[in-house]
Curated annotation (Swiss-Prot):
Belongs to the uracil-DNA glycosylase (UDG) superfamily. UNG family. This is Uracil-DNA glycosylase. SMART domains: UDG (SM00986), UreE_C (SM00987). GO terms for cellular component: cytoplasm. PROSITE patterns: U_DNA_GLYCOSYLASE.
């Protein structure tokens, strides 16, 4: 492993900042008062659990966790096995079908196998109230995930950032394009996918970049863990 720094090494100080402690306290208070918050507490930081800092090859930025029952589990765009694949992820699968030879759309939307290969699936806000999109957008999560992006930018080299939609592109404005590979396209949402997400070829381009820099390409076919099959 070329880079042995862990998320704990680089984020321990940030997690003691007053704003971050306040964010955690606000979320905990809402849960304790009976408000349903997604994802479940144990899953809020799954993006970091499944993809260690030294293993990050690709970053895909989402925005808000899914706010429907049983959907969000801490990985952007991903849903738990047994939950219907959401429209944006279906459009990601469609782009994969059109560009990756042999890719066949899976019957689930669980992307842990991407995360285990080094794809950091990072929502920029890490919690949401049930049924209320963007309800936690101003709690401080954006400050925290800005820091995460700046730490990847600083401590890693040659990471591919896939920035889909204006929110992700603004969020990624700090990335040093001399050190990293930044690809931009419209969001895969049904509202914007036809404006240039389809045909962006990002999954192919990401793998080409990784191979050119001596990294193993990503197998974009999502595979369920053996125990879920």
């Amino acid at each position: 492993m070329a880079n042995e720094l862990t998320w704990h090494d680089v984020l321990a100080e940030e997690k003691q900042q007053p704003y971050f402690l306040n964010t955690l306290q606000t979320v905990a208070s809402e849960r304790q008062s009976g408000v349903t918050i997604y994802p479940p507490q144990k899953d809020v930081f799954n993006a970091f659990r499944f993809t260690e800092l030294g293993d990050v090859k690709v970053v895909i930025l989402g925005q808000d966790p899914y706010h429907g029952p049983g959907q969000a589990h801490g990985l952007a765009f991903s849903v738990r096995p047994g939950i219907a694949t959401p429209p944006s992820l279906l459009n990601m699968y469609k782009e994969l079908e059109n560009t990756i030879p042999g890719f066949t759309r899976p019957n689930h939307g669980y992307l842990e196998s991407w995360a285990r290969q080094g794809v950091l699936l990072l929502n920029t806000v890490l919690t949401v109230r049930a049924g209320q999109a963007h309800s936690h957008a101003s709690l401080g999560w954006e400050t925290f995930t800005d820091k995460v992006i700046s730490l990847i930018n600083q401590h890693r080299e040659g990471v591919v950032f896939l920035l889909w939609g204006s929110h992700a592109q603004k969020k990624g404005a700090i990335i040093d394009k001399q050190r990293h590979h930044v690809l931009k396209a419209p969001h895969p949402s049904p509202l914007s996918a036809h404006r240039g997400f389809f045909g962006c070829n990002h999954f192919v381009l990401a793998n080409q970049w990784l191979e050119q820099h001596g990294e193993t390409p990503i197998d974009w076919m999502p595979v369920l863990p053996a125990e879920s099959e």
